[in-house]
Amino acid sequence: MAVTDELLGPILRDVSRSFYLTLRVLPSTVRSQIALAYLLARTTDTIADTQLVPAEKRMQKLQQFRARIRDEGAPPVDFTHLAREQDNEAERVLLQHSGEAIALLDKMAGADRGQIQLVLETITRGQELDLVRFGDGRKLKALETADDLDDYTY
């Protein structure tokens, strides 16, 4: 099975639940771009939500991965430790194939790549804010201002 087929087939299906079914109704001209954007976003979500890894380490990996999404010349991110900490097999496989997802992004046409990078920039900034605001997530913590709430819900 080709890398693209595996990423946008079984791996996407296993981590996306109903979204995988939704992709079938999208125009074929945008299906692979949206599928890849979803896979990258799901990867960043897995990074941010791995509770067995300290929040500081998750933040570091999230920032490294965002840098790699943004810049083809940035070093690859090693998710070996993070993948080992996954209880969910599908998320483990997703992390193990993150380099292949990045390689697909690097091959995308400039406009498509730029749109995916923009979406992932917004998503990862929000995930970073969550890690700063809520840390390890063990204690309930309210947002302090209406602006914080607006930022959080964006």
Question: Language-model features: where?
Answer:
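Acidic catalytic motifs of isoprenoid enzymes
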Residues: 1-154
